[in-house]
Amino acid sequence: MDNFPNKTYKVIYADPPWYFKSRSEKGEGRNPNQHYDCMELKDIMNLPVKDIADDNCILLMWAIDPMLDKALQVINAWGFQYKTVGFTWAKTNRTNLGFFTGLGYWTRANQEMCLLATKGRPKRKAKDVAQLVVEPRQEHSKKPLLHKKIEKLVDGPYIELFARKKPFPNWDYWGNEV
């Protein structure tokens, strides 16, 4: 993942490729490193995100339950202060309206959180952006498209870090799959 951006953004949207060991009766096929290149925590923390964050910036970062404490470390390392959960994705099954039941160390996981952190005093545009997102689960780690919700919530410029595709022309994207 070269060519880190060299301009500043008011919104940074990130889905870090966390490296962690998972246990599954189905084997390593559910482990993230079987699907994409993962990064160690120290490498994620050392990315120069501080350099691209505007003085008044929002960070929206996906975090899986077992990595929540690590996600908070990343937020701090990148120069942000945790505020709240920005979005909660309740996963449904692909073929019916029932909720998806995933893995879990204590309880079976269904949701993923997108944490919201700030630097400075960014301005919120709308007060009616819902936190809950109910959408079908897709291929491994693919998140629902929240870009329009984010655009309604705050003004850009916008960047998605660790992006896989470029779905919206008014966003910048960085990652080894774009």
Describe the residue ranges of each PLM region.
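Class I S-adenosyl-L-methionine-dependent methyltransferase catalytic core
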Residues: 1-178
